[in-house]
Protein backbone atom coordinates (compact mmCIF):
# COMPACT_ATOMS: atom_id res chain seq x y z
CA UNK A 1 0.00 0.00 0.00
CA UNK A 2 1.35 3.43 -0.94
CA UNK A 3 1.45 5.80 2.00
CA UNK A 4 0.40 9.44 1.69
CA UNK A 5 3.99 10.61 1.99
CA UNK A 6 5.04 8.31 -0.84
CA UNK A 7 2.24 9.65 -3.06
CA UNK A 8 3.39 13.20 -2.39
CA UNK A 9 7.01 12.34 -3.17
CA UNK A 10 5.99 10.62 -6.41
CA UNK A 11 3.95 13.67 -7.45
CA UNK A 12 6.90 15.94 -6.74
CA UNK A 13 9.17 13.74 -8.89
CA UNK A 14 6.66 13.88 -11.75
CA UNK A 15 6.46 17.65 -11.34
CA UNK A 16 10.25 18.03 -11.58
CA UNK A 17 10.34 15.91 -14.74
CA UNK A 18 7.66 18.05 -16.35
CA UNK A 19 9.23 21.33 -15.23
CA UNK A 20 12.40 20.51 -17.19
CA UNK A 21 10.41 21.01 -20.40
CA UNK A 22 7.54 23.35 -19.48
CA UNK A 23 8.63 26.99 -19.36
CA UNK A 24 6.52 30.11 -19.34
CA UNK A 25 7.56 33.24 -21.21
CA UNK A 26 6.15 36.75 -21.24
CA UNK A 27 4.28 35.91 -24.49
CA UNK A 28 3.05 32.52 -23.27
CA UNK A 29 3.19 32.30 -19.44
CA UNK A 30 2.73 29.11 -17.41
CA UNK A 31 -0.52 28.31 -15.58
CA UNK A 32 0.32 26.10 -12.61
CA UNK A 33 -2.10 24.30 -10.29
CA UNK A 34 -1.71 23.24 -6.66
CA UNK A 35 -4.21 21.25 -4.60
CA UNK A 36 -4.27 20.97 -0.83
CA UNK A 37 -6.77 19.02 1.25
CA UNK A 38 -9.12 22.00 1.53
CA UNK A 39 -8.20 24.47 -1.22
CA UNK A 40 -7.21 24.81 -4.87
CA UNK A 41 -4.66 27.36 -6.10
CA UNK A 42 -3.75 28.56 -9.61
CA UNK A 43 -1.01 30.96 -10.69
CA UNK A 44 0.08 32.40 -14.01
CA UNK A 45 3.87 32.72 -13.96
CA UNK A 46 6.43 34.31 -16.29
CA UNK A 47 9.46 32.06 -15.76
CA UNK A 48 11.92 34.29 -17.63
CA UNK A 49 11.39 37.12 -15.13
CA UNK A 50 10.39 34.90 -12.21
CA UNK A 51 7.19 36.88 -11.63
CA UNK A 52 3.64 35.80 -10.80
CA UNK A 53 1.34 37.67 -13.19
CA UNK A 54 -2.01 36.54 -11.76
CA UNK A 55 -3.29 34.19 -9.10
CA UNK A 56 -6.59 32.77 -7.91
CA UNK A 57 -7.55 30.36 -5.16
CA UNK A 58 -10.46 29.20 -3.08
CA UNK A 59 -8.98 31.07 -0.11
CA UNK A 60 -9.97 34.39 -1.69
CA UNK A 61 -12.93 36.07 -0.08
CA UNK A 62 -14.92 36.53 -3.31
CA UNK A 63 -14.83 32.78 -4.03
CA UNK A 64 -15.17 31.60 -0.43
CA UNK A 65 -18.49 33.41 -0.06
CA UNK A 66 -19.82 32.00 -3.34
CA UNK A 67 -18.82 28.36 -2.76
CA UNK A 68 -20.35 25.77 -0.48
CA UNK A 69 -17.17 23.65 -0.49
CA UNK A 70 -13.68 24.89 -1.34
CA UNK A 71 -12.20 21.53 -2.35
CA UNK A 72 -14.55 19.99 -4.93
CA UNK A 73 -14.72 20.17 -8.73
CA UNK A 74 -17.17 23.10 -8.67
CA UNK A 75 -14.62 25.09 -6.69
CA UNK A 76 -11.95 24.17 -9.24
CA UNK A 77 -14.21 25.42 -12.06
CA UNK A 78 -14.68 28.75 -10.29
CA UNK A 79 -10.92 29.11 -9.78
CA UNK A 80 -10.41 28.35 -13.48
CA UNK A 81 -12.90 31.02 -14.51
CA UNK A 82 -11.39 33.58 -12.13
CA UNK A 83 -7.79 32.97 -13.25
CA UNK A 84 -8.85 33.25 -16.91
CA UNK A 85 -10.64 36.55 -16.25
CA UNK A 86 -7.58 37.93 -14.44
CA UNK A 87 -5.37 36.82 -17.33
CA UNK A 88 -7.63 38.54 -19.86
CA UNK A 89 -7.43 41.78 -17.85
CA UNK A 90 -3.63 41.63 -18.15
CA UNK A 91 -3.81 40.89 -21.89
CA UNK A 92 -2.85 37.21 -21.66
CA UNK A 93 -4.66 34.93 -24.10
CA UNK A 94 -2.26 31.99 -24.55
CA UNK A 95 -0.64 29.98 -21.77
CA UNK A 96 1.29 26.78 -21.12
CA UNK A 97 -0.55 24.46 -18.71
CA UNK A 98 1.47 22.92 -15.87
CA UNK A 99 -0.53 20.32 -13.94
CA UNK A 100 2.21 20.07 -11.26
CA UNK A 101 2.49 16.30 -11.41
CA UNK A 102 -1.22 15.71 -10.80
CA UNK A 103 -3.23 13.51 -13.15
CA UNK A 104 -5.27 15.42 -15.71
CA UNK A 105 -8.49 14.27 -14.09
CA UNK A 106 -11.10 15.57 -11.66
CA UNK A 107 -10.25 18.97 -10.16
CA UNK A 108 -7.28 19.68 -12.42
CA UNK A 109 -9.33 18.87 -15.52
CA UNK A 110 -12.27 20.97 -14.28
CA UNK A 111 -10.00 23.97 -13.66
CA UNK A 112 -8.37 23.64 -17.10
CA UNK A 113 -11.67 23.28 -18.96
CA UNK A 114 -13.20 26.27 -17.15
CA UNK A 115 -10.15 28.38 -18.06
CA UNK A 116 -10.49 27.27 -21.71
CA UNK A 117 -14.22 28.09 -21.76
CA UNK A 118 -13.50 31.55 -20.36
CA UNK A 119 -11.06 32.27 -23.18
CA UNK A 120 -7.54 31.03 -22.43
CA UNK A 121 -5.84 29.01 -25.17
CA UNK A 122 -3.57 26.08 -24.35
Swiss-Prot record:
GO molecular function, one term: 5S rRNA binding
Entry GO CC: cytosolic large ribosomal subunit
Keyword entries, A-Z: Ribonucleoprotein, Ribosomal protein, RNA-binding, rRNA-binding
Superkingdom of source: Bacteria
Gene Ontology BP terms: translation
KW Ribonucleoprotein (keyword) present: yes
Assembly with partners or alone: Part of the 50S ribosomal subunit; part of the 5S rRNA/L5/L18/L25 subcomplex. Contacts the 5S and 23S rRNAs.
Function comment: This is one of the proteins that bind and probably mediate the attachment of the 5S RNA into the large ribosomal subunit, where it forms part of the central protuberance.
Recorded family membership: Belongs to the universal ribosomal protein uL18 family.
Protein name, entry field: Large ribosomal subunit protein uL18
Organism expressing this protein natively: Petrotoga mobilis (strain DSM 10674 / SJ95)
Gene name as annotated: rplR
